Amino acid sequence: MRPITILCTLATLSTTLAVPFSQASKSTSASRSTSSSTVPASLPSPTLSGPNACPPNKFKQCCTTLSQVGDDLLKPLGAVVPLVGAIQVNSLVGVSCRPMADAAPESTCGNAVMCCDSSTVGGDDLMQTSCQDFALAKKREREAIERQQRRFSEYQRMMLSQSATPAPTSTGVDVMGSSFSKAKATPTRV
């Protein structure tokens, strides 16, 4: 193989492995082993965490981000070289984070409020990469709960439509050779 081909292949491979992706998995086989008289019980609706609290398994922290550090470094240089002042650094890596109470409003943090994984809370790491911006974490939490509620309502609708369809009647042959039916008339409300 040519060296350029190997280099391009390795670069593509490393890029595809570095970028996380989510794949929606759809199951094509549906289980119909449930009885038609079974009506699904209602599940408890998931609740959002408090307005100032991070989603479950995340902890609220006040962090200095790399974008704030970059702005602090580039703004003074921008006064001398205007082109440098136009550079913007965006990062969600937390630097020197300190824990915050869930009830504490965002205004008490002079830096960026972030929701960090439990594994990073109280760690001695200078940089915490498993943090998420507070507003983004709350938005994703709301979207996840809405998705779960839509799926559950679709499941309920499917189960109710299956229970409304009549079951097939069984017919047989009597001992004397005459046919009979075990079908019963039942009122159905729609």
From Swiss-Prot:
Induction profile: Only expressed at moderate levels in planktonic and sporulating conditions.
Record Pfam families: Hydrophobin
Localisation per UniProt entry: Secreted; Secreted, Cell wall
One GO MF term: structural constituent of cell wall
Disulfide feature: C54-C115, C62-C109, C63-C97, C116-C131
Cellular component GO terms, alphabetical: extracellular region; fungal-type cell wall
Keyword line: Cell wall, Disulfide bond, Secreted, Signal
CDD domains xref list: hydrophobin_I (cd23507)
Subunit structure of this chain's protein: Self-assembles to form functional amyloid fibrils called rodlets. Self-assembly into fibrillar rodlets occurs spontaneously at hydrophobic:hydrophilic interfaces and the rodlets further associate laterally to form amphipathic monolayers.
Annotated domain remarks: RodF contains a signal peptide and the conserved Cys-pattern. Although RodF contains one extra cysteine residue, it is located in the N-terminal secretion peptide. Its hydrophobicity profile resembles that of class I hydrophobins except on the C7-C8 region, where class I hydrophobins show a highly hydrophobic sequence close to C8.
Protein name per its UniProtKB record: Class III hydrophobin F
Native source organism of the sequence: Aspergillus fumigatus (strain ATCC MYA-4609 / CBS 101355 / FGSC A1100 / Af293) (Neosartorya fumigata)
Gene this chain is encoded by: rodF
